[in-house]
Amino acid sequence: MRRLNNSNELKIGAFLSYVQTGAQILVALLYTPVMLRILGQNEYGLYNTISSTISMLSVLSLGFSNAYIRFYARYKVNEEKEKIERLNGLFLLVYFIIGIIAFLCGLYLSFNLKLVFDEGLTAEELEKAKIMMILLALNLGISFPMSTFTSYINAHERFSFIYAINIVKIVCSPFVQIPLLLMGFGAVGMTAVIFAFNMFVNLAEVIYSIKKLNFRMKLGHWEKGLFKSLFLFSSLIAINVIVDQVNNSLDSVLLGRFCGTAEVAVYSIGATFCGYYTIFSTSISTVFIPRIHKIVNSVQDKLEQNRQLTEIFIKVGRIQYLVLALVCSGFIVFGRAFIALWAGEGYEASYWVALCRMVPATVALIQNAGIEIQRAKNVHQYRAYSMIVMALVNLVLTIFLCQRWGAVGASAATGIAAILCDLFLLNWFYYKKTGINVFRYWKNILRQSAGLIVPCICGFFIARYASMQSYITLALWIVVYAAVY
């Protein structure tokens, strides 16, 4: 019965993950144009510049949330309840300390913004940025210890609750933000609403963990060597987290410094599409994380373990590729027309920003399961090495290209770095260090790609000859393309 319940929870979780994705996209489609026209390009650019800056402090998590799943799975297999309680206590303590450090760092930045944005922001923008930075720093400081409860719920595979509570946040946030925007609170008002809803989610997760999942914790008397094991495991994940965060936020920060908030706004619109593109892949792979760790911890025969992990790698990859190929090819065909209608004048370059990010990212996104397989096998240091290379290449290229071609140059730099890391280095690591049959994986993907020939030909003629001057005609052609696909 328990196995059946877990199976149902995975199915419901996978379903709700796509409901959440759909909700995010629908809200973005309806809300973002309204927000852009109320805020204006510079104010929207300011909001994204500050969000990207403060988000860099999230690297202080040091990958501990991933370590929690690993050690929880180990203790759960042996039914070591007391060790789980002490694990909970250790994580709460560590994250509480990290939260304080993150808040203090954010507070320091808020009163010393000229250290980062000496020329990119005006005096008025700096004043608004200070308030936003304080709110976001407080949000980050509280969210760190609360993430222990999120990890606890995920470890129990209660994905339906996680996704349901986030769907509520996604759907309700615009209904609170729009009145504040109309009242003239601008980017500061948006930041305040984000803070309030995040606190609501945190509180809901705490109550659910304690009342429904019997969350308990104990401080002290930890297993000998536990913290050392956690630190060694998490330190390599931390490198990945830091590099991911740098690659995701670096472009906006550098554009804010060298090119101003208007160019950040153009970049942010393009990056938004890439963000939703990423969600399509991670939403399905997330529900397989506990199962991957269970296989690694329970299947002792290495050949059988690698066989099962390869099956998951291929299964998840094929599903992800089926969805992402439709989204990416569809954006290539319809993205330019959609951005013109949706965002309005001044955002034409956002189409190229999105393409420079989306196309190279596809390789990594259809292999998301491999990241967790590396972590479960404790060989994730190899991904860390490749990500360091990616970050350095991205940093150097972005500094030069963003000053020459603005937002498009910054996104092109990120795309080049992603191809180097994801297509070449990571696939070699998967094959050599995790035992995944990468050749079998790519054979499956190539066979699947044959089905794209007809849709691509159809898309070429639609993009070249079809009129898409309104939402109605655009929607009709999208339906035609999706039907052919």
Residue map of PLM features:
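Helix-loop junctions and terminal segments of transmembrane helices
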Residues: 62-78, 92, 155, 213-214, ...
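Membrane-interface helix-loop junctions in multi-pass transport and translocation proteins
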Residues: 34-43, 160, 171-203, 381, ...
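Signature of the first transmembrane helix
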Residues: 9-74, 102-107, 139, 169-174, ...
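Interhelical loop/hinge segments that connect adjacent transmembrane helices in multipass membrane
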Residues: 1-10, 127, 187, 203-248, ...
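Membrane-interface junctions at transmembrane-helix termini in multi-pass inner-membrane proteins
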Residues: 7, 11, 140-166, 183-188, ...
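Transmembrane helical elements of multi-pass membrane transporters/channels
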Residues: 12-28, 193-205, 209, 224-294, ...
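Transmembrane alpha-helical segments of multi-pass transport proteins
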Residues: 131-135, 232, 390, 404, ...
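Interfacial segments at transmembrane-helix termini and the short loops linking adjacent helices
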Residues: 110-135, 331-362, 434
